[in-house]
């Protein structure tokens, strides 16, 4: 399991070269980039193959491969609104394009419903991804669906059902260790989802009470029990990257990056 980190941890004041340099110096072995709105190291819907070639050269320079392509836009692929749904499909296609050119093996997808009722939205999402399956399989890029707090995937059973109904070996789960830790055990989700898990976000969580919680940095105090989490990942045979995801601080992000990479090293040994 390689140590990876999402570029959001560096901050928008730094360009691609500085971002790769800081991530490499901190001790990470890979980096996850993002399809976003405009930003210093953001990929956008307008990013071209020529733009990506420059990033490939930076990646080679620092010997830091791109582990995946995440995104903060275009999640409503389960919407009954055709325009919303098509915009989400276009985002997935763009992520696949970016991943292919950057040598990344996976993208992160966040399905959503818009204003569509939950059950209907899931069936629309499944049909949308079935229609995308030939494109996905042609690229050979893995698509991992992430459970976020948007009310779409409420349990590991919802995730498993959606993935299984789509029915492609290239569509699975991008599991975020902390996103389910508010009311359940992360290791239980890992065990239930099993080999559907294609990629992992390693993130901390601190549940102080039913109504009070936080997402501390990996090297800070949290309530996730990393021993059973790592045991569950090993049991399902997961060997992909552990990608840290956290926001950038004000000022230089180097200290947070170094401490986070060290925290992953320690967690890997559990």
List each language-model region with its residue ranges.
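Acidic/histidine-rich catalytic cores of soluble enzymes
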Residues: 30-34, 130-223
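A short, acidic, amphipathic alpha-helical segment used as a generic capping/interface helix at domain edges
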Residues: 223-235
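Active-site acidic/histidine proton-transfer and metal-coordination neighborhood
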Residues: 17-18, 53, 57-65, 75-172, ...
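Active-site beta-loop-alpha junctions enriched in small/polar residues
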Residues: 6-10, 34-38, 71-74, 112, ...
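Glycine/Thr-rich phosphate-binding loops of Rossmann-like dinucleotide-binding domains
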Residues: 41, 117, 210, 252
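Long hydrophobic alpha-helical segments typical of transmembrane helices together
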Residues: 229, 238-253, 257
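Hydrophobic faces of well-ordered beta-strands that scaffold small-molecule active sites
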Residues: 3-7, 31-33, 66-71, 107-109, ...
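N-terminal pre-domain/capping segments
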Residues: 1-101, 130, 168, 195, ...
């Amino acid at each position: 399991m390689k140590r990876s980190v999402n570029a959001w941890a560096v901050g928008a004041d730094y360009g691609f070269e500085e971002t790769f340099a800081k991530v490499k110096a901190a001790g990470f072995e890979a980096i996850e980039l993002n399809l976003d709105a405009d930003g210093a190291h953001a990929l956008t819907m307008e990013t071209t193959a020529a733009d990506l070639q420059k990033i490939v050269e930076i990646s080679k320079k620092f010997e830091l491969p791109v582990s995946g392509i995440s995104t903060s836009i275009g999640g409503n692929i389960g919407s009954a609104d055709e325009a919303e749904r098509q915009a989400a499909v276009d985002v997935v296609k763009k992520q696949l394009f970016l991943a292919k050119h950057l040598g990344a093996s996976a993208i992160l997808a966040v399905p959503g419903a818009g204003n569509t009722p939950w059950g209907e939205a899931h069936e629309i999402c499944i049909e949308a991804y079935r229609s995308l399956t030939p494109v996905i399989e042609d690229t050979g890029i893995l698509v991992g669906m992430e459970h976020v707090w948007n009310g779409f995937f409420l349990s590991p059973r919802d995730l498993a059902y959606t993935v299984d109904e789509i029915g492609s070996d290239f569509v699975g789960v991008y599991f975020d260790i902390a996103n389910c830790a508010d009311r359940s055990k992360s290791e239980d989700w890992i065990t239930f989802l099993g080999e559907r898990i294609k990629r992992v976000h390693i993130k901390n969580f601190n549940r102080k009470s039913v109504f009070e919680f936080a997402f501390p940095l990996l090297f800070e105090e949290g309530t996730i029990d990393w021993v059973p989490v790592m045991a569950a990942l090993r049991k399902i045979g997961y060997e992909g990257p552990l990608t840290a995801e956290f926001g950038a601080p004000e000022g230089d992000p180097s200290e947070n990056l170094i401490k986070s990479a060290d925290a992953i090293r320690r967690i890997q040994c559990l």
